[in-house]
Structures are given as structure tokens and as C-alpha cells.
């Protein structure tokens, strides 16, 4: 077990800002405006979901499994931050990752089905809002992981 290999954990706002900034760079070069809007919306939804889910997944995987670590290390972790609190925070991060991916899976077909660019952008905006709300729900858990690191 090497606790020094745990990556720097981003705050909720950093995570959201990074995901939205990277998604804003996604563009499609298709002549038909409505078709371009659909393709761009689909790629942007995937981009936001991936840029939120991947860091959350890396945070969960970076922490050691408490079932297989040495009892001494486990007791030190329990005394300093609390194993149960740490498990709860990691579980919340994993839940948020799954929820964000599920939202993307739900909204991509909706974005593809829209015919007009305006409706497609509304669907994309709705997906963004739901994904960012999920991340904001685990803000306390991410802050706990930052302090536990």
C-alpha cells in the first residue's frame, strides 16, 4: 500500500469547470446546421460525462482497499480520518460517476432524436445541468477526500 500515489483530488467546481471547458472545444464540421448541432451536442454530452467520470473513477481506484491492507495501516487510517467516513466518501464518488454516465446514456438518444438545433441545445443544456447537480451533491464527500489525502 502506498498512500503517496493517491492523485490530487479536484474540488467540485474545478471538476465541473474542466469538463465544461473541454466540452466547449468540441465542434463538428458538417454543412447542415441541424445535423451539426445534433452531432456536436452528442459529442459534448459524452465529453462532459467522460471528463467528470474518469477523474472520479481514478480517485476511487487510487485509494487502497480496506479489506486487504495491513491492520496497522487500517488502524492509522481509522484514527486519522475514519475508515467508515472514507468508505462513504469513496462510495459517493463512485455513485456520482455511475450517475453521470447514466445521464449521458439517457440524453444522447434524446439529442440525436431532435430535429432542430434549438431543441438539441436545450437537451444538451438539460444534460449538463443534471450532471453538474450530481457532482455538486457530492461536494462534501470530495472535500473530505481532499482533506483525507
Predicted feature residues:
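N-terminal accessory targeting/assembly segments
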Residues: 1-100
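Charged, amphipathic alpha-helical linker segments immediately N-terminal to NTP-binding catalytic cores
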Residues: 90-147
Amino acid at each position: 500500500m502506498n498512500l503517496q500515489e493517491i492523485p490530487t483530488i479536484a474540488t467540485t467546481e474545478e471538476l465541473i469547470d474542466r469538463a465544461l471547458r473541454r466540452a466547449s472545444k468540441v465542434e463538428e464540421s458538417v454543412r447542415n446546421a441541424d445535423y451539426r448541432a445534433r452531432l456536436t451536442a452528442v459529442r459534448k454530452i459524452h465529453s462532459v460525462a467522460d471528463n467528470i467520470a474518469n477523474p472520479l473513477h481514478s480517485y476511487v481506484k487510487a485509494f487502497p482497499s480496506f479489506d486487504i491492507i495491513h491492520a496497522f495501516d487500517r488502524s492509522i487510517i481509522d484514527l486519522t480520518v475514519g475508515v467508515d467516513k472514507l468508505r462513504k466518501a469513496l462510495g459517493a464518488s463512485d455513485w456520482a460517476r455511475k450517475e453521470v454516465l447514466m445521464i449521458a446514456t439517457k440524453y444522447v438518444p434524446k439529442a440525436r432524436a431532435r430535429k432542430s438545433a434549438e431543441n438539441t441545445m436545450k437537451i444538451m443544456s438539460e444534460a449538463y445541468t443534471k450532471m453538474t447537480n450530481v457532482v455538486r451533491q457530492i461536494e462534501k464527500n470530495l472535500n473530505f477526500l481532499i482533506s483525507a489525502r
